[in-house]
Amino acid sequence: MAVIAVYSVKGGVGKTTIAANLAWFSAAISKRRTLLWDLDAAGGAGFLYGIEPSKRARAGSVFSRDVDPAELIHKTEYDRLDLLPADESLRDLDGMLARIGKKRRLERMTQALAKRYERIVLDCPPVLNEISAQVVRAADLVIVPLPPSPLSTRAFALVAEEIRRHSPAHPPILPVFSMIDRRRALHREAQDANPNWPMIPLASAVEQCAVRQQPVGVFAPASAAAKGFQQLWTAIERKLAEAG
């Protein structure tokens, strides 16, 4: 089993869309039993799969009251793909983790799910606190979406530095350009400066994920966006294989 965290300290970089689509590629293309776990109280991952948050707001209970995560898992309409949705109870997750004082709570829970899933994709909130520290401890690979700009390399270095600060024995980190538009000179310059970074294009198909509440591979499998997610997923599987 491998845990893949999609994490950024900055919002609005396509993090949730990337996490939701990677989970689908894991289940549909790699044929792996996959869990998409939404840790962001905004609940975007659930929305992208048409799953509404529970009115009972229990997502935080798996951390605070030792509720089995399996009790809150929803099946999606896609084979091998399940979702553990977020809700407003996660808004105080940082304080909750600080109060219970269990530094590896998330790691232990993902390990407990290893019998059911081969891949767990975490959609993480854009924060630098105990949540991000627990994510780094639990993850086998951290995906960092970045906007294409001349400062992308510096931005990635800062995120990587923070990850190392929280966990010296940190997992591999894979940067990915999100919302890249090759028609823009600055975007081309950023990509040319980092040609080995995977990229997700700025495309209407990506925007349609929220409208259709479906992964792009379902309704636009031949699109540039679907190819971008496929290439990113291939890079992820390669990184995991290299890490052993």
Predicted regions and their residues:
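P-loop NTP-binding core
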Residues: M1-G244
